[in-house]
Amino acid sequence: MLDPNKIRKKVPVNDFIALIRKYSHEQIEDGGHAFDRLSSRQRELFNIGEVRKLLLKEWPFLVGIQENSNHAVFYKHQGKNLRIILKLETAKVKIVTFYYIQEWQIPKI
C-alpha cells in the first residue's frame, strides 16, 4: 500500500506560484482541520489570514504533489520550515493542514 502523503511529483515553484495566484484571498479557506496540529500559542499567532497571505505573497522553497493528489508546499517562515497541505479545486483552495517540520523531514525529491 502506498503512503498517501508521499510526494510523487515535484512541481516547479514558478508553476505553483502562477497556479495559486489565480485564486483570490476569499477562495482560500480552512478545510476544517487546518489548525488542529497547532498548539494554543501557535493558534494565537497563526490564523487563516496569515496562511492566505503566505500562500499568495511568499515563495515556497519546495512544492510537490502527494499520492493523494494534494499539494505539499514548503516555506521558510520565521526561521522554521513550514509544510502546508492544500487541496486545489476549481473554485477554491482548501488548507488541509499545516505544521512546522524539522530539516530532516523535508522530502528529498
Segments predicted by a language model, with ranges:
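Ribonuclease/tRNase effector modules and their secretory precursors
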Residues: M1-I109
